[in-house]
Amino acid sequence: MDYNFVIFGSDGGFYKTAYSDIMELNSVIYRESLWGVNNKITALIYKLYHTSRLPNRHLPFKNLLYRAISDFHFSDNRPVCFLSFGRNIHEKTYPFLFYLKRNYPDAKFAIYYQDLIATHPHTDINWIKQHFDLVLSYDYNDAERYGILYYPTPYSSIPVETGIGTEKDLYFLGATKNRFTEIIEAYESCTQNGLKCDFNLVGVPGKQQVYKDDIHYIKSMPYRENLSRASRSKCLLEILQKNAKGYTPRM
């Protein structure tokens, strides 16, 4: 059976780029979060909803928020498949999931983890498997570990501007997570062997930063800039975080 799709995604530059091929389809609604808050009233209720001082059961106007953010319109009456990114689903958002299930009884519900499940601190994977029709992971090991389906990171076809800059031999961009030592060792080995490197590390504390004249320590990078830098490099470096086997979207 064919479906219309509601994707509860992310406002991150990569995700909006990776899913751009389907965003303009009449059968797809892409939201940059679970809520897609777009007016002051629902934004205020949303803020109340996420304060740790207010338990779910005491939230005023909860149904008003749910109605405001679940008014989906398609050109036909096909059933809906709701696909959520993993970080959107946690204890605070379970009630909204049940609201959707009550109001869309013919719908299917899928969830896609695009990072290791262990990095989602509030995820009860057994609960997730009980309440979703389809559970996916970008990482092959995670899929095996938790008994869910493996699905590689999606991409869309987009034009890339190379921009202006010196061509590099090797390019790396990423948060260090649990691989800082391996990243620095790779940098040292490559530069000692004469390679021109463009290393960009995200969110590294100042006291931990080394080779600061040559390595770029940043808070974030627009995904289009990442693509531009990658296109000016001969090779991209992938260093998987520990326990991971799924490749990440370097370009």
Language model segments and positions:
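Nucleotide-sugar donor-binding catalytic core of glycosyltransferases
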Residues: M1-D71, S75-N77, F85-F96, Q114-M251
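Residue-level recognition of the N-termini of beta-strands and the immediately preceding loop/turn
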Residues: P79-V80, A107
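Short, conserved beta-strand segments within well-ordered enzyme catalytic domains
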Residues: F82-L83, A110
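Active-site proximal beta-strand in glycosyltransferases
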Residues: L100-L116
